[in-house]
């Protein structure tokens, strides 16, 4: 009987000791490596390549691993397949730019239920499928900035302009369009005559831009709020020999637009730094995976802190204007 009691006590002590060893932090005092699935709208897009560059920078600082993935075309179905793969890999966090806010929510809700920290960036996921969303800037500031550029480029701040957007279901572009329309109240001489959708695909965006130019021969400005669409719009204006007559502006990447800026096709444009966006969302994702809480200000490393509102949305920074005076410098970076 005494031997049995000793054996039981030994087993209890062993279980307790083993549990303590399993729960203890690594011997070197460093936190365990966090794996973050960084999901792009589509691969082969320069904007998201730059996002990944910033994400890898943050991962290096934090001792984390970023798995950069995405579909080959910007569809919800492609992203759902990508997300299911990340869930199967049991990543610690997922950061996604949504092609469709509602279509992704059920899959991401399943990820949340399994303990994966889910955040969106750039283009928001519906609230049911995320803990927080990091907007690159506020929608209001983006709308005001784009309309401000149109007003600067249109003769005497007056005239017609058309817009090439991404997909009809893209959360961020639709919000920016709404704020652009609101900002028009401050510029009564401007008229938005059409919105076309290039689906963030170069060839389709080009065709839509050419169609707008032919349907509205009196356009003063052609705008794109998609980085892919802005390059396509610039090419369309140049190919149609309308440089100088129709100004092109919007949201794009310095590395893709520097040549068009120097030729006067795109006199100026705006964008936040996608490297900073990737860096910031990775800082947030790792912070949450290590026990952080979005009810409190969350560190974004060198970008400072972000405070998320009651809707779970926070803004990184305001857009920056690029023109002939600075585009070459930034083109070397992204």
How would you name each of these model-derived features?
Residues 18-22:
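Bacterial signal peptide processing site
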Residues 32, 168, 172, 183, ...:
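Hinge/cleft segment of the Venus flytrap/periplasmic-binding protein
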Residues 33-58, 62, 67-81, 91, ...:
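Extracytoplasmic "Venus flytrap"
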Residues 38-39, 90-98, 117-121, 162-163, ...:
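Periplasmic-binding protein-like
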Residues 47-61, 142-149, 171-190, 204, ...:
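Short, solvent-exposed amphipathic alpha-helices that sit
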Residues 79, 134-161, 204-206, 253-257, ...:
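Hydrophobic alpha-helical segments within soluble ligand-binding/sensing domains
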Residues 96-112, 180, 198-260:
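Hydrophobic alpha-helical
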Residues 102-141, 152, 160, 254-262, ...:
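Flexible loop/hinge segments that line or gate small-molecule binding clefts
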């Amino acid at each position: 009987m005494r031997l049995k009691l000793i054996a039981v006590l030994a087993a209890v002590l062993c279980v307790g000791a083993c549990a303590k060893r399993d729960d203890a932090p690594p011997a070197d005092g460093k936190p365990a490596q966090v794996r973050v699935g960084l999901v792009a709208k589509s691969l082969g897009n320069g904007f998201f390549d730059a996002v990944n560059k910033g994400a890898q920078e943050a991962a290096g600082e934090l001792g984390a691993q970023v798995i950069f993935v995405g579909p080959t075309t910007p569809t919800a179905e492609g992203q759902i397949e990508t997300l299911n793969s990340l869930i199967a890999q049991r990543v610690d966090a997922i950061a996604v730019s949504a092609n469709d806010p509602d279509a992704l929510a059920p899959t991401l809700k399943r990820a949340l239920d399994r303990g994966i920290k889910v955040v969106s960036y750039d283009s928001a996921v519906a609230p049911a499928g995320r803990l927080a969303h990091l907007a690159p800037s506020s929608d209001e500031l983006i709308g005001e900035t784009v309309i401000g550029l149109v007003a600067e480029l249109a003769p005497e701040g007056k005239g017609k302009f058309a817009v090439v957007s991404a997909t009809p279901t893209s959360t961020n572009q639709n919000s920016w369009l709404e704020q652009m329309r609101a900002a028009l109240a401050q510029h009564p001489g401007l008229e938005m005559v059409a919105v076309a959708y290039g689906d963030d695909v170069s060839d389709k965006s080009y065709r839509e831009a050419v169609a707008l130019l032919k349907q509205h021969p009196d356009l003063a400005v052609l705008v794109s709020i998609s980085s892919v669409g802005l390059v396509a719009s610039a090419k369309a204006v140049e190919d149609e020999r309308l440089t100088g007559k129709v100004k092109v502006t919007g949201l794009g990447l310095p590395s893709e637009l520097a040549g068009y800026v120097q030729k006067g096709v795109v006199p100026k444009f705006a964008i936040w730094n996608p490297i900073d966006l990737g860096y910031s969302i990775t800082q947030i994702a790792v912070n949450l995976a290590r026990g952080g809480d979005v009810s409190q200000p969350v560190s974004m490393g060198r970008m400072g802190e972000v405070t998320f509102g009651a809707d779970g949305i926070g803004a990184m920074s305001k857009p920056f204007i690029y023109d002939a005076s600075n585009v070459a410098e930034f083109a070397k970076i992204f």
